[in-house]
């Protein structure tokens, strides 16, 4: 950290958000540009539960590139040996990870995973501020961003940064304040319930099952837990009143496979609604800033690409930032172009996958997935 006048901290790069994308930027910068002063500002203490995710085996090279592969293995996340899906028909089909190049995947404890990445960045010299929010970004005449940072105990200080990374997730709070517009491609929500497993829940596969008004997801969690979600559009979620536990379980009992996995389990909470819509920013870079991870673009959970995309995005962003500090702005242009191409490819894959399910032609949920994508600016 570089100090300046009273109550002002100076950094080359200020990263707003300490999730996988923000941490990946920091870790990669420490590797490729160790002279840069870098700070992460994270709103949480990494102590609240976070929705889990199945991490594909292909993440191994990214974690190794960031220098955290051994630390990741030491966390002992639950193994995931593949995915089972009932999609386009009632019969389950399996995709076994173990036959691929990198073997098994993992059911992530996201809280521990995110905290591990941030801790590794801090150990490498990144300043980590937790329970801290950033407000009032201002760009004064000297070209540096000025940020006001507040902790949860109401202490505040100012930060001067030559470059800002928006890693604030779907909110994209910094980028949107700079005029970037969020373009929505659907209104997908997840109604999530955490459950305590029964003794019969022994398989470690992620289970995906299509239903008339959406689709179901379930995966194991540490400590004999399981997370399950009913995924549908916001208007359908409201119509079915899925925040009501009884209504959620009524829908779950209409499934063919998910109910057999969940009925032995005991719910630990009422359904929680979380945004899962696909979106992108109309631009992911600007004057001395860029957006990474879900702040730049977010994929449908069906892709199982959330954390993988976040890490890859963070690494690519770090290359663009390194070029910027060498006086070369073309890296930011390349980053913008790569992001656009990646999202175009995702939309094609998304359309192909949803197009495989044709059992409910009169369902609004499936009709929307089979129609041409209509862009919506938020």
Regions picked out by a protein language model, each given a short descriptive name:
Residues 5-21, 39:
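Beta1/beta-strand and adjacent pyrophosphate-binding region of the FAD-binding site
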Residues 319-378:
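C-terminal helical "tail/cap" subdomain of flavin- and related membrane-associated enzymes
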Residues 16, 27-51:
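Glycine-rich FAD pyrophosphate-binding loop
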Residues 75, 236-317, 329-333:
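FAD/FMN-dependent oxidoreductases across multiple families
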Residues 91-109, 146, 231-235:
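Helix-loop-beta segment of a Rossmann-like dinucleotide-binding subdomain
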Residues 120-258:
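Predominantly flavin-linked oxidoreductase catalytic cores and closely associated redox partners
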Residues 48-84:
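N-terminal FAD cofactor-binding segment of flavoenzymes
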Residues 99-120, 238-243:
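Short beta-strand to alpha-helix junction loop
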């Amino acid at each position: 950290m570089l100090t300046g006048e009273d109550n002002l901290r100076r950094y080359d790069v200020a990263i707003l958000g300490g999730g996988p994308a923000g941490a990946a930027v920091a870790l990669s910068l420490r590797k490729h540009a160790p002279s840069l002063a870098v700070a992460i500002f994270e709103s949480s203490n990494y102590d609240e539960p976070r929705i889990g995710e199945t991490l594909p085996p292909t993440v191994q090279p990214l974690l190794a590139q960031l220098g955290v592969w051994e630390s990741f293995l030491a966390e002992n996340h639950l193994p995931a040996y593949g995915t089972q899906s009932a999609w386009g028909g009632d019969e389950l089909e399996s995709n076994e990870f173990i036959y691929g190049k990198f073997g098994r995947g993992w059911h992530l404890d996201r809280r521990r995973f995110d905290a591990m990445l941030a801790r590794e960045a801090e150990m490498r010299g990144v300043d980590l501020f937790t329970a801290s929010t950033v407000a009032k970004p201002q760009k004064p005449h000297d070209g540096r961003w000025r940020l006001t940072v507040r902790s949860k105990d109401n202490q505040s200080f100012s930060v001067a940064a030559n470059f800002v990374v928006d890693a604030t997730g779907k909110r994209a709070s910094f980028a949107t304040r700079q005029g970037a517009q969020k373009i929505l491609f659907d209104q997908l929500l997840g109604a999530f319930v955490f459950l305590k497993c029964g003794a019969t829940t022994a398989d470690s596969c992620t289970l995906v099952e299509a239903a008339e008004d959406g689709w179901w997801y379930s995966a194991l969690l540490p400590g004999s837990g399981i997370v399950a979600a009913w995924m549908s559009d916001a208007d359908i979620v409201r119509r079915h009143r899925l925040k009501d536990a009884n209504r959620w379980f009524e829908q779950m009992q209409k499934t063919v496979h998910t109910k057999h996995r969940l009925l032995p389990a005991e719910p630990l909470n009422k359904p929680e609604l979380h945004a899962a819509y696909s979106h992108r920013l109309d631009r992911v870079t600007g004057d001395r800033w860029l957006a990474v991870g879900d702040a730049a673009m977010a994929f449908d959970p069906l892709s199982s690409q959330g954390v993988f995309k976040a890490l890859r995005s963070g690494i690519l962003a770090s290359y663009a930032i390194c070029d910027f500090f060498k006086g070369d702005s073309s890296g930011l242009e390349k980053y913008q172009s790569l992001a656009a191409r990646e999202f175009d490819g995702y939309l094609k894959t998304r359309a192909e996958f949803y197009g495989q399910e044709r059992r409910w032609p009169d369902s609004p949920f499936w009709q929307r997935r089979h129609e041409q994508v209509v862009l919506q600016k938020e």
